[in-house]
């Protein structure tokens, strides 16, 4: 492909990927299969690898990249990001409405009523249609510049969709973590023995303040845009018009925004969302009222802290009393024992709550929770049931203090509590409960993502002794699957196909799937990038592991202990024999990989590789592709009809390899 053809194709791919990103992340209406989308992205990555000069800051491939930063820079907002005054009841709303109408000499007023998202306020600055800066609200006048982290949020456009955008525009929105993503994040953190986030807002805030954008990208954040802070080239008459324009430009604007002209309509809307809010996939803690006409907003003005033309109505937090009927123990995939309170069913925040995790023995003792206690509960972030504390004044004397068992409730093995940790663990690596949850973890969405292998199927496979470890999944037959309940021939074929397709998963997914204690998705990716293969990771010593950024002594110990066990090494060997991918599927970290330090030049036309594909394969293994031959070049890969690079390589005595030898080089490296 000629350079001008590559440039045109790269721009075509960017536009196509942006279109599908908008359909998926903003409109929630995809029109393309995941596999086809992935193919487009891979083609663009390959082109930009082969032609680095084609990479642009707003390319979809540049959402996550660069080294972790050392800190955050403070920047000034073009217009202050003021906080909103609060209203907590009907009287407060009536006072606000009266002040507005008095300030406008009883003119007609329309209110835009928006959901009040419980997240992190940010500003996004676009210059000539391209995202150049993102910042937190901070103190309203200045905030922290977090552009690399905000770029990882797929629903934030890197460039505006419609032509004619102003030279400079600063828009405002609320970054949030969806309920499902929050629940999964805390589950993974609990499994890995990490502190839990109290609510989605804290999780979103912590994710945005990561020095490494790669961590932010893994947290599944999203955003709703709610206004324009500054623009130098476009004028709106109403706030609702500005919201419509933002939607046309590709931003996510919440569909539940409404316009009302009377306070009675507003109050009915507030009552509707008092219960309906719990059905949303994200957390809201109230609604926001804004005067719609911008000329009226200007006349009403602002105080030092907040605009006079807007107010935030906040719902009171929901709490309930119930009784602890029992405390049971759950054994996780790493062997950690998690106590769970069985509660008398009670209605709370839109659902019936009957259980709440107590996390560990220390927390039970700290909150003085006993079996039979009356306790006060709420939902952390309107999602996760949490016991706030007991009500000692309501005790009858029949309550029973809880004591952690000394043996595993599943296999009767001895329990251990590692020094310096709050968790208690089953010492038996073959514990049935650990095995079941290890399998469920292995096939989960963030691990090997094998559709159709849910809890019911896993349980049957274990009961019939068809699997004893994750590697056995790859030897299942059609006959064995058809013999399971509710698995017909078609379902069996689909399941076998999903299992076979999962063999091509990345090395990072494989490492995460193994369930190594303290090794989450982020650590798995870092280890995959550093060592390039599962064999390389297994051979690594303590110093090599701790030399990886963010991999401290705790994770290093876990990795060493995991691969020191004969049983785990046998599982890995079975996975290799089954054909599971065990090498890095992405460029190795700088200075690592089998081709680390090797420089390649490509010349001529290859039969089985495009130039972009060959470059990508070299980069995946840690090598480097350059355009000019020099004495520092290690290999010149020779295709048909080579140019002057071949002559220069001969003159300089550089090692020249033809396509068959190049293929042998790649296959030899990837077979270890």
Swiss-Prot record:
GO terms for molecular function: DNA binding; DNA ligase (NAD+) activity; metal ion binding. GO terms for cellular component: cytosol. Signal peptide: none annotated. Pfam families: BRCT (PF00533), DNA_ligase_aden (PF01653), DNA_ligase_OB (PF03120), DNA_ligase_ZBD (PF03119), HHH_2 (PF12826), HHH_5 (PF14520), Nlig-Ia (PF22745). Keywords: DNA damage, DNA repair, DNA replication, Ligase, Magnesium, Manganese, Metal-binding, NAD, Zinc. Zn(2+) binds at residues 408, 411, 426, 431. It comes from the Bacteria. Residues 590-672 form the BRCT domain. GO terms for biological process: DNA repair; DNA replication. It is an enzyme of class 6 (ligase). NAD(+) binds at residues 34-38, 83-84, 114, 137, 174, 290, 314. Belongs to the NAD-dependent DNA ligase family. LigA subfamily. DNA ligase that catalyzes the formation of phosphodiester linkages between 5'-phosphoryl and 3'-hydroxyl groups in double-stranded DNA using NAD as a coenzyme and as the energy source for the reaction. It is essential for DNA replication and repair of damaged DNA. This is DNA ligase. It comes from Desulforudis audaxviator (strain MP104C).
């Amino acid at each position: 492909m000629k350079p001008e053809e590559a440039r045109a194709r790269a721009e075509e791919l960017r536009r196509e990927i942006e279109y599908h990103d908008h359909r998926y992340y903003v409109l929630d209406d995809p029109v393309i299969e995941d596999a086809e989308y992935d193919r487009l992205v891979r083609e663009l990555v390959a082109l930009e690898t082969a032609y680095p000069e084609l990479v642009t800051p707003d390319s979809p491939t540049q959402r996550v990249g660069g080294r972790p930063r050392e800190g955050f820079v403070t920047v000034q907002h073009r217009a202050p990001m003021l906080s909103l005054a609060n209203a907590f009841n009907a009287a407060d709303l009536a006072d606000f409405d009266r002040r507005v109408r008095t300030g406008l000499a009883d003119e007609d007023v329309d209110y835009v009523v928006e959901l009040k998202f419980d997240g992190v306020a940010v500003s996004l600055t676009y210059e000539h249609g391209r995202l150049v800066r993102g910042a937190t609200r901070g103190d309203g006048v200045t905030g922290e510049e977090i552009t690399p982290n905000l770029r990882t949020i797929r629903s934030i456009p890197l460039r505006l969709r419609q032509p004619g955008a102003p030279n400079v525009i600063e828009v405002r929105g609320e970054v949030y973590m969806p309920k499902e993503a929050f629940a999964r994040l805390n589950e993974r953190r609990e499994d890995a023995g990490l502190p839990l986030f109290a609510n989605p807002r804290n999780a979103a805030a912590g994710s945005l303040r990561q020095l490494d954008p790669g961590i932010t990208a893994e947290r599944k954040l999203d955003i709703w845009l709610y206004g324009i802070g500054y623009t130098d080239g476009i004028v709106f008459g109403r706030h609702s018009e500005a919201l419509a324009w933002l939607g046309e430009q590709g931003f996510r604007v919440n569909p539940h925004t409404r316009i009302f002209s009377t306070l009675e309509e507003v109050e009915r809307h507030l009552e509707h969302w008092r219960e309906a809010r719990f059905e949303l996939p994200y957390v809201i803690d109230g609604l926001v009222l804004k005067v719609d006409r911008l000329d009226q907003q200007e006349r009403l003005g602002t105080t030092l802290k907040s605009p006079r033309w807007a107010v935030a109505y906040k719902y009171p937090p929901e709490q309930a009393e119930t009784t602890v009927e029992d405390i049971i123990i759950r054994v996780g995939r790493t062997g950690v024992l998690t106590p769970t309170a069985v509660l008398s069913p009670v209605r709370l925040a839109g659902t019936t709550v009957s259980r709440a995790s107590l996390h560990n023995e220390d927390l039970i003792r700290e909150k003085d929770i006993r079996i039979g206690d009356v306790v006060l509960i709420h939902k952390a972030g309107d999602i996760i049931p949490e016991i706030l504390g007991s009500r000692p004044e309501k005790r009858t004397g029949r309550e029973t203090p809880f004591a952690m068992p000394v043996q595993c409730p599943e296999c009767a093995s001895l329990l251990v509590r590692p020094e310096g940790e709050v968790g208690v663990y089953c010492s038996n690596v073959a514990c049935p409960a650990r095995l079941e949850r290890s399998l469920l973890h292995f096939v989960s969405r963030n691990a090997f993502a094998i559709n159709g292998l849910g809890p019911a199927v896993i349980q049957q496979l274990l009961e019939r002794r068809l699997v004893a470890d994750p590697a056995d999944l790859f030897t299942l037959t059609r006959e064995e699957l058809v013999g399971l309940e509710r698995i017909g021939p078609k379902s069996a074929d689909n399941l076998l196909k999903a299992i076979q397709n999962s063999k091509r998963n990345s090395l990072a997914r494989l490492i995460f799937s193994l369930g190594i204690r303290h090794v989450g998705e982020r650590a798995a990716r870092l280890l995959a990038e550093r060592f390039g293969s599962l064999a390389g990771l297994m051979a690594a010593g303590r110093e090599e592991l701790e030399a990886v950024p963010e991999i401290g002594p705790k994770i290093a110990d876990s990795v060493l202990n995991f691969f020191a066990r004969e049983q785990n090494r046998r599982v890995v060997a079975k996975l290799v024999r089954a054909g599971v991918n065990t090498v890095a599927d992405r460029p190795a970290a700088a200075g690592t990989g089998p081709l680390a330090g090797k420089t390649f030049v490509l010349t001529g036309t290859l039969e089985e590789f495009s130039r972009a594909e060959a470059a990508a394969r070299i980069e995946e293994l840690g090598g480097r592709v350059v355009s000019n031959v020099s004495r520092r070049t290690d290999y010149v890969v020779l295709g048909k009809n080579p140019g002057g690079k071949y002559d220069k390589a001969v003159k300089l005595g550089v090692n020249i390899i033809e396509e068959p030898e190049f293929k042998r080089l790649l296959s030899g490296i990837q077979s270890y």
